[in-house]
Amino acid sequence: MTEKLRALAKLFVLVFLLRSLGMPRGLAQSKDWQASAQADPVLQAMRVELERSKTQLKLEAVAAPYYIEYRVIDDDEYSAQAAFGALGADLRSRFRFLRVVVRIGDYKQDSYFHQGEGSSNIMPLDDDPLALRHQLWIATDRAYKSAAESLTAKQSQLKQLTVDQPVDDFARAEPLQSIEPLAKLDFDPRPWNRMLEDASTLYKTDPQLESFESSLKFQAINRYFVNSEGTVVRSGQSYYEMNFVGRSQAADGMSLERDKGFVANTMTELPSAEAFLSAAKDLAGTLRTMRDASLVDEEYRGPVLFSPNASTTIFADLVGENVLGYKPELGKNGRTSKAFASSYKSRVLPDFLSVIDDPTLATYRDRPLLGKYEIDDEGVRARSVSVVENGMLTNYLIGRQPIRDFPTSNGHGRARIPNNPAGPSLGNLIVTSSEPLSAEAMKKKLIDLCQQRDLPYGYFVDSFGSKLAPRLIYKVWVKDGHQELVRGAIFGDLDTRSLRNNLIAAGDDFSVKNHLLNIPHSIVTPSILFDELEVKRANQSKEKLPEYPPPLVSKSAIQQVSAAK
């Protein structure tokens, strides 16, 4: 074997050992993470002040902290909004927020209760070491005093309560060190603003469009985290979001709204100017169709088919929210505070469906995922978690606050921006079927079920609005399979029980729904078919139509906007 081959073999063994020992990827890739940390003024100030707090933070008659953490969020963002063909807002902003958590007691019982959950502060942007450390010092002192008061209040309350199966207040975690590159926001806003202006001119194409607005938000978010256990983490991620929304009114006064968004990890994943305008035109056309659509029938109980896009909303609301392992309030005996609290090792979905949450994935079948991260906001490495296996609930997503039967974190403790406490959160929630059907087979199954029950039509839902209210819903006629758009529908019984008992098939297709919100995450789901759901007419108030028409728009202006650009 040559010297070069020997060297390569040694390198291979070293990398293998680092990974098998759970060594942080950031550390394995960096020759000297400490040098990188010292070169970062924010991280250096956090580490220096943390060491000072560990040795000097002690009040008379109050125990010293057993745990301290500092978390800083640096958010550089640009936002813009256009309406009626003109830019209405154009703002570049940047802020740094600090959150300090000081825990008194021990891992079994500590002060993390009400005001003891942490102290917040605004951090300076100029990287002055003394200014940074001063804000850290102020927040740490305040957090320590609040922790002392909270521990007393908590112990007093516990004397009046009985908990059958108490669990620890905090989970231990191995220290990690990972220094990733900082994210930066560097772009020319002018072409993006022109895209917003062009899309918002679509109000001219339809006098009955009350408004058509477009907006964007680009963010570069850098996270810093250190704790007294030895964890030092810096990560950076950029997010890019573009939206448009149109509003109109049906002849009977019903308010109609449609929106569409594009969310990406990189600017290159956003649509081109032509694609963005084309999507906006499609949405405006859908609003015109919705105005002419008839109202949904007052009563229907039967099969309903949901597109992959619509099913992402169902699984986000009925599964995603309920697999989060939030610890119950003090004195409560439940496993969690959500609907699946008593469903551990019980069936929550049909046996052909399984669900995982895998924040380590960057893509799913070549589609980018927004919920990827390496280390969560509590300093724990992200892990893939099998949440539902063959319909059976097997896990909850948890952070470092244990719940019954789950004493340690599985890397899902994340914090809302800018400075909320960390808690269980989704990463990339992925639903799969062991018995997938083609789109044609799913529609045929819908029609067959309707025929068996002498129903003239079934329903197909393509998208949702808020609170699981369908926004695009179609009658699928048994006679010839054609689809007819209707409006004004709500579901009477779309809940966790119907998800468990009435969901009978899933497709081989899928949709990826990327959500930015305050905690970026992704939902991946197939189309799904329920054998029976109640669909009824919404009892919503209707506003009167405008008393007189909008200002006239010249035919030439309409033609200019309608022409492909």
Sequence positions of predicted segments:
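Long, low-charge, small-residue-enriched segments that form tightly packed helices used
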Residues: 140, 360, 378-565
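Active-site bordering "gate/hinge" segments
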Residues: 27-375, 380, 389-390, 492, ...
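Intrinsic disorder/low-complexity segments
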Residues: 8-10, 29
